[in-house]
């Protein structure tokens, strides 16, 4: 039994493109971390995977995505003001999106991370506030979702697009190496 330890509809949708049969069991793990953005993302993914594995067993995938700039991790905004400050900070600059993952398979942990660089165009206040009013940034690390309206903000990316959405293809390849059938219908 393959289990996705996430409530994210984006992760569920990406995984379903490649693997047909899996269950979704959101994690109840407390999200706390320290260290570099990469260490933080992997630590949070481990916490999620371990918590769900302790309840349901099977093969469990935990993932967590962080946005960082100047070594500072940007989580999900707590309110519109914080969303504005995050988007203003990202405006016209390159930032990093890192997804940590942990797969628990047959009691063993396989953990890693993928990082993608993203450059935003210069964003004026009118555009930032128009985006915030859509409600889209409020449940996303760094206050944006590349797969939605914020795709307009992106000048370029270097790396895995799906990583920026929150589920890098590296996870699919790891599952394939573990014997899970991909691309079957």
UniProtKB/Swiss-Prot annotation:
Localization in the cell: Cytoplasm
Major enzyme class: hydrolase
Active-site residues from the entry: 64
InterPro entries per record: ITPase-like_fam, Maf-like
Known catalytic reactions: dTTP + H2O = dTMP + diphosphate + H(+); UTP + H2O = UMP + diphosphate + H(+)
Role this protein plays: Nucleoside triphosphate pyrophosphatase that hydrolyzes dTTP and UTP. May have a dual role in cell division arrest and in preventing the incorporation of modified nucleotides into cellular nucleic acids.
Family annotation (HAMAP family): Maf
Protein name: dTTP/UTP pyrophosphatase
Higher taxonomy: Archaea, Methanobacteriati, Methanobacteriota, Thermococci, Thermococcales
